[in-house]
C-alpha cells in the first residue's frame, strides 16, 4: 500500500483505474461520432455552401464592379468626345454666321454704293439735260432778243 501512496491516489481518490475509464472513453468516441455525423458534417456542409456562395458573390461583384468602371470610363470618353464635337459645331456655326453677316453687310454696302452711284449718274444726267435745256432756252431767248432788236431798228 505504501507503493500506491507514493505514485498517486489511493482507492476512491482522484483517479481510479477500473471499468469507468474505458466506458468513459467509449462514450466520448460514440458522442464524437454521433455529433460528427448528426451535427458537424451537416453544419460544415452548410458553412461550406455559404462560404462558396459568399465567395462566388464577391467574385461576381468584383467582376461587375470592374465592368461598371470600364463602362464609366467609356461613357466619360464618349462624353468628352461629344463635348469636343459640340464645341467644334458651335465654333463652325459661329464662323458661318460671321461669314454670312460679312457677306450680307458687303452685299448691302455694294447695293447702297450702286444705288448711290445710280442716283449720282441720274442727277448728273438731269443736271446735264437741264443745262442743255437752259442753254437752248438761252440761245432761243438771245436769238429772240436779237431779232427784236433788229426789227426795231
UniProtKB/Swiss-Prot annotation:
GO MF term (any one): proton-transporting ATP synthase activity, rotational mechanism
GO CC, one annotated term: proton-transporting ATP synthase complex
Residues passing through the membrane, by range: 23-40
Recorded superkingdom: Bacteria
UniProt-annotated location(s): Cellular thylakoid membrane
Predominant subcellular localization, coarse grouping: membrane
Keyword annotations from UniProtKB, A to Z: ATP synthesis, CF(0), Hydrogen ion transport, Ion transport, Membrane, Thylakoid, Transmembrane, Transmembrane helix, Transport
Membrane topology, record value: Single-pass membrane protein
Stated role: F(1)F(0) ATP synthase produces ATP from ADP in the presence of a proton or sodium gradient. F-type ATPases consist of two structural domains, F(1) containing the extramembraneous catalytic core and F(0) containing the membrane proton channel, linked together by a central stalk and a peripheral stalk. During catalysis, ATP synthesis in the catalytic domain of F(1) is coupled via a rotary mechanism of the central stalk subunits to proton translocation.
Matching NCBIfam families: PRK07353.1
Family assignment from sequence similarity: Belongs to the ATPase B chain family.
Protein name: ATP synthase subunit b'
Native species: Prochlorococcus marinus (strain MIT 9215)
Amino acid at each position: 500500500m505504501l507503493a500506491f501512496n507514493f505514485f498517486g491516489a489511493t482507492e476512491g481518490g482522484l483517479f481510479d483505474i477500473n471499468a469507468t475509464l474505458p466506458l468513459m472513453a467509449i462514450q466520448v468516441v460514440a458522442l464524437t461520432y454521433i455529433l460528427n455525423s448528426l451535427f458537424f458534417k451537416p453544419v460544415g456542409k452548410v458553412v461550406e455552401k455559404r462560404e462558396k456562395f459568399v465567395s462566388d458573390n464577391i467574385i461576381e461583384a468584383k467582376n461587375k464592379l470592374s465592368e461598371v468602371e470600364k463602362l464609366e470610363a467609356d461613357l466619360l470618353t464618349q462624353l468628352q468626345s461629344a463635348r469636343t464635337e459640340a464645341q467644334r459645331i458651335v465654333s463652325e456655326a459661329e464662323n458661318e454666321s460671321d461669314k454670312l453677316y460679312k457677306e450680307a453687310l458687303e452685299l448691302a454696302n455694294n447695293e447702297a454704293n450702286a444705288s448711290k452711284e445710280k442716283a449720282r449718274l441720274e442727277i448728273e444726267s438731269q443736271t446735264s439735260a437741264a443745262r442743255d435745256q437752259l442753254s437752248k432756252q438761252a440761245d432761243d431767248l438771245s436769238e429772240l432778243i436779237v431779232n427784236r432788236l433788229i426789227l426795231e431798228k
